[in-house]
Amino acid sequence: MPRRREVEKRKILPDPKFQDRIVAKFVNNLMRKGKKSTGERIIYGAFDQVEAKLKDDPLKVFKKALDNVKPVVEVKSRRVGGATYQVPVEVRQDRRTALAMRWLIDYSRGRGEKTMVEKLAGEIMDAASNRGNAVKKREDTHKMAEANKAFAHYRW
């Protein structure tokens, strides 16, 4: 938190194929060791597979999957008088998107398919139809917040 002025958010250029900032952000999250071209190849390959299997616009399916994975509430630890409480808090819009992307990528990597393209395509299709581990993670997060609703008055 700077004292002088608010730090401006870095502008992310849209991706070359779909001209979409969310896809570009997803590529940046997917990328390892700065290999952006590999990240782009993976996501565009996954989009091709989604289009082939569902006969639908892959960008629409991807955005639907992302919306299905976005959490609304999460719990944060708050220490009050020697006890630590899990306090439910609402998630900011930019953090929702970031968490959804992170979960989609993490659970894609843990899937059983052979290549990352197949794993990501499978997880996107599952998430778009409200199935899969990323959606389960969101449900678990919501359940935790619901279970700890009694501590909501500890919000800061």
Swiss-Prot record:
One GO term (biological process): translation
Gene3D superfamilies assigned to the protein according to its UniProt record, in alphabetical order: Ribosomal protein S7 domain
Keyword terms, alphabetized: Ribonucleoprotein, Ribosomal protein, RNA-binding, rRNA-binding, tRNA-binding
A GO-annotated cellular component: small ribosomal subunit
Molecular-function annotations in GO: rRNA binding; structural constituent of ribosome; tRNA binding
InterPro entries noted in UniProt: Ribosomal_uS7 (IPR000235), Ribosomal_uS7_bac/org-type (IPR005717), Ribosomal_uS7_CS (IPR020606), Ribosomal_uS7_dom (IPR023798), Ribosomal_uS7_dom_sf (IPR036823)
Short name of any one Pfam family annotated for the protein: Ribosomal_S7
SUPFAM superfamilies: Ribosomal protein S7 (SSF47973)
Similarity comment: family membership: Belongs to the universal ribosomal protein uS7 family.
Known function: One of the primary rRNA binding proteins, it binds directly to 16S rRNA where it nucleates assembly of the head domain of the 30S subunit. Is located at the subunit interface close to the decoding center, probably blocks exit of the E-site tRNA.
Description of how the protein assembles with itself and partners: Part of the 30S ribosomal subunit. Contacts proteins S9 and S11.
Record protein name field: Small ribosomal subunit protein uS7
Organism: Anaeromyxobacter dehalogenans (strain 2CP-C)
Phylogenetic classification of the source organism: Bacteria, Pseudomonadati, Myxococcota, Myxococcia, Myxococcales
